């Protein structure tokens, strides 16, 4: 994998940044009424795409298409955007090129399951050198004070672990 991509200086120290909580109300109907697809990643999940490679209701990485392409220039799915305008605006407000954009309903799981399902994403596999590094943004939609994301630089080394609280 090439590392000749533009990166943000704010990511240099830890590789991640915690954004401010979103202070605007979001009607739960925006994520509850979306069309979810039967597509599995890890854990007990459901996925509702808002943007995909070609604007279809599917969740594949953009590199799975013929021809394969970088995980950028996603096409908003009109029927989903109409249901979730506030969520879409939250994404668009970042001002970045959006690739896959999905609502992921992940059921609570154990710490052991979280580690078992951990994986290193390879979202830059088709990203041309000299372009911006593909990033992921996570936004917790429901309030669970015990919810957190586990990040590890080395999946086998607990000393590299960071836990990020996920307030709604």
What do the predicted segments below correspond to?
Residues 1-102:
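Non-heme Fe(II)/2-oxoglutarate
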Residues 90-168:
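Catalytic core of non-heme Fe(II) oxygenases with the double-stranded beta-helix
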